[in-house]
């Protein structure tokens, strides 16, 4: 399982998604939680629609010919179905690790087994700082981390 707003879909997101597919393997399934328009509206910068962001995800998955089955579910809050669903692992970045820890705490409270947390390193831009959607929207970097000014 992996989740986010994925707008714009940058190299950090791509690493997260690729790792999710690699962990699931050919016989597994990847669940991608994609923030709804309402939940994403809390961001300080403009966000494209759910459908536009979903199309970008599907195109990235197809382009990379991932063979693992996947499902994109609407994410209405930080946890989505992760506190209740049956799954084995969640893939997070350094930035979203606290959410995964909280998910496992909630699962324990509900009598569910904890899931494995796989943390990836955030992808760094040319300037050594994390690639982030906020930095891209501010015009500091592009989706590959190239400094724009």
Question: Language-model segments: which ranges?
Answer:
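Nucleotidyltransferase catalytic core that binds NTPs
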Residues: 1-149
């Amino acid at each position: 399982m992996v989740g986010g707003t994925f707008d714009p879909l940058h190299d950090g997101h791509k690493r997260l998604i690729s790792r999710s597919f690699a962990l699931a393997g050919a016989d597994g399934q990847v669940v991608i939680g994609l923030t709804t328009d309402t939940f994403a509206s809390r961001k300080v910068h403009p966000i494209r629609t759910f459908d536009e962001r979903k199309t970008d995800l599907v195109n990235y998955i197809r382009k990379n010919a991932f063979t693992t089955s996947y499902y994109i579910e609407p994410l209405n809050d930080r946890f989505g179905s992760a506190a209740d669903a049956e799954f084995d692992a969640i893939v997070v970045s350094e930035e979203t690790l606290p959410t995964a820890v909280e998910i496992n705490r909630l699962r324990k409270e509900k009598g569910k087994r904890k899931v494995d947390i796989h943390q990836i390193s955030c992808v760094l831009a040319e300037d050594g700082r994390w690639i982030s959607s906020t930095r891209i929207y501010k015009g500091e970097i592009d989706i590959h981390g190239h400094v724009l000014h």
